[in-house]
Amino acid sequence: MDVNPTLLFLKVPAQNAISTTFPYTGDPPYSHGTGTGYTMDTVNRTHQYSERGRWTKNTETGAPQLNPIDGPLPEDNEPSGYAQTDCVLEAMAFLEESHPGIFENSCIETMEVVQQTRVDKLTQGRQTYDWTLNRNQPAATALANTIEVFRSNGLIANESGRLIDFLKDVMESMDRDEVEVTTHFQRKRRVRDNVTKKMVTQRTIGKKKHKLDKRSYLIRALTLNTMTKDAERGKLKRRAIATPGMQIRGFVYFVETLARSICEKLEQSGLPVGGNEKKAKLANVVRKMMTNSQDTEISFTITGDNTKWNENQNPRMFLAMITYITKNQPEWFRNILSIAPIMFSNKMARLGKGYMFESKSMKLRTQIPAEMLANIDLKYFNDSTKKKIEKIRPLLIDGTASLSPGMMMGMFNMLSTVLGVSILNLGQKRYTKTTYWWDGLQSSDDFALIVNAPNYAGIQAGVDRFYRTCKLLGINMSKKKSYINRTGTFEFTSFFYRYGFVANFSMELPSFGVSGVNESADMSIGVTVIKNNMINNDLGPATAQMALQLFIKDYRYTYRCHRGDTQIQTRRSFEIKKLWDQTRSKAGLLVSDGGPNLYNIRNLHIPEVCLKWELMDEDYQGRLCNPLNPFVSHKEIESVNNAVIMPAHGPAKNMEYDAVATTHSWVPKRNRSILNTSQRGVLEDEQMYQRCCNLFEKFFPSSSYRRPVGISSMVEAMVSRARIDARIDFESGRIKKEEFAEIMKICSTIEDLRRQK
């Protein structure tokens, strides 16, 4: 029988059906090929929005730069980046007036952070532009390479381990006339294999040093590498995102720390909180506006959308904001915070890999690297690409494009939120000095605006004034994409509000299912996702029970671990049946060993091993959780592990799940093909770090491991720890006098070696 899908909605209130309209089932779209075209679009668009600004040339790099600040007053409807400095400063002053001491206190908090942050903060984050190799690397490797190059160039402030000292090196490196870097390269030769007598390509890895002059070094230090944003749902076109190098990252981190501290104190800010906390914050603002509007006023809410938020923001404005926020603070603090926006005013966008060409006969493919775009004959390109290249050419230097205006995606989320909130703050009656007033919510580029007034004309006037105020600060509310409703129905950061928040369950759909970490983690993550959705997203008991059954089924098919008494034949079924037959208490077998599922919606919080422990045969317990069993992974099992799950929008979320170390928590081995590439040096570095860290963890088991607060190296910390432990063990009689003496001797030897180095 066919079911008419509209029948499903007859009894459902419209607002609860919202989640069915979201494009969140199935795989998200990924990008293929290079991001060069998208990056050129971004650069060209950004310049177009600021085109009536003033052109200048960077004296160090020769890059042409466009400065739209205090440019012509913006025109209606056209997105533009002509922010007015005095307006921004005034908005900041009013924000401070409504929140006395907010900037002062945030500065004090940030100063503490600045003095305590260690340089390993920069190892967080995934791909980072590595300026030494001129391509992307994992953050930890990029940082290590940077420090290695700094030290070989005599920049050693970073040895203290504090981030602020590393940044001193960055500052000094920019004054150097030349910087020497080591690059990895590959040599290929054809040789005859002795055994098979066939010709094979042999690859060897070489390292060579070369010098960058001041101009080349500055260009690299100011470069943001670009990539295509993957897995973006609900969009037809892809777009470019940026990843900055290590020189910029530390400075950005401190600016964002300050801005985060301010956002935490602002009731209109949707950052840095998330989830239920964010919903509570939003509900408060709505409640405030509704209670005040019950009798005499009407209240409307705009679900707002801004046109090209990043491309119209300007680092120079951020500099003005920081200058204001840090007034009366020590000089060193003001300087360190102003460097990030200054670097962003001089940034260069790397155009990525370039273009791929295929000949009509399909026999030949060739890549045109971005460096060649400046002077290649344009007859090979189609019209739209031709236009892009012509437009970007005056801005090109060494395959990077000068991009002074605009802020690439996701760099200053917190600080731009402060800017947005400062406009919402101006909606108080004491500032509007008329009958309408407004308030709202801001989270990076997303906003919701609530306007109250005695009549419709007042609402219109309020919205117009808000729109024009935004224009003066370089924010462009899109009249086409924003829509207005009676207060009580709006959407903000994909939360739908209808007299309270409606669970938008479709957004959680991608995180259901088997994650693919390993059998142990997947079981734990799967049930935790269901549990969390029962708590947060209106997942009802019947649906949750069904989700659980589907998950178990999915899990069994993924790991081919159907019940021991099933008829389904898989590669594992022979072994699993054997285990099933020789097990007395079959209920004690884990699902991944062909056991039955004992989960129901009441016990989702208990790890499966704990749930079944009492039911297990003794010898099964011994095999499953025996630390001497070579298959039990004890690499880094904490009682709580973190899984990265991908919700439908926003960044990947960290989700905690309980981890019990068993034979099922294996860690897969690295693919060997990397060993033959130029990445090999990187891999060797990584293994060296791994060994050092493992050694360090032996000295500081996790129970006693506190972040070292003093400024000492890992070696010093380990030596002093060894001495303390040896003394305790000697005095309690656990080790003999000779052993104690030997340990002390080794410690002294290590210290001598360090001094000689």
UniProtKB/Swiss-Prot annotation:
It is an enzyme of class 2 (transferase). The lineage of its organism: Viruses, Riboviria, Orthornavirae, Negarnaviricota, Polyploviricotina. Its EC number is 2.7.7.48. One of its GO terms (cellular component) is host cell nucleus. Belongs to the influenza viruses polymerase PB1 family. RNA-dependent RNA polymerase which is responsible for replication and transcription of virus RNA segments. The transcription of viral mRNAs occurs by a unique mechanism called cap-snatching. 5' methylated caps of cellular mRNAs are cleaved after 10-13 nucleotides by PA. In turn, these short capped RNAs are used as primers by PB1 for transcription of viral mRNAs. During virus replication, PB1 initiates RNA synthesis and copy vRNA into complementary RNA (cRNA) which in turn serves as a template for the production of more vRNAs. Residues 50-82 are annotated as: Disordered. It is found in: Host nucleus; Host cytoplasm. One of its GO terms (biological process) is viral transcription. Residues 249-256 are annotated as: Promoter-binding site. This is RNA-directed RNA polymerase catalytic subunit. Phosphorylated by host PRKCA. Influenza RNA polymerase is composed of three subunits: PB1, PB2 and PA. Interacts (via N-terminus) with PA (via C-terminus). Interacts (via C-terminus) with PB2 (via N-terminus); this interaction is essential for transcription initiation. Interacts (via C-terminus) with human PKP2 (via N-terminus); the interaction competitively inhibits the interaction between the RNA polymerase subunits PB1 and PB2. A motif (Nuclear localization signal) lies at residues 187-195, 203-216. It catalyses: RNA(n) + a ribonucleoside 5'-triphosphate = RNA(n+1) + diphosphate. Residues 286-483 form the RdRp catalytic domain. PROSITE patterns: RDRP_SSRNA_NEG_SEG (PS50525). GO terms for molecular function: nucleotide binding; RNA binding; RNA-directed RNA polymerase activity. It holds the Pfam family Flu_PB1. It comes from the Viruses. Keywords: Eukaryotic host gene expression shutoff by virus, Eukaryotic host transcription shutoff by virus, Host cytoplasm, Host gene expression shutoff by virus, Host nucleus, Host-virus interaction, Inhibition of host RNA polymerase II by virus, Nucleotide-binding, Nucleotidyltransferase, Phosphoprotein, RNA-directed RNA polymerase, Transferase, Viral RNA replication, Viral transcription.
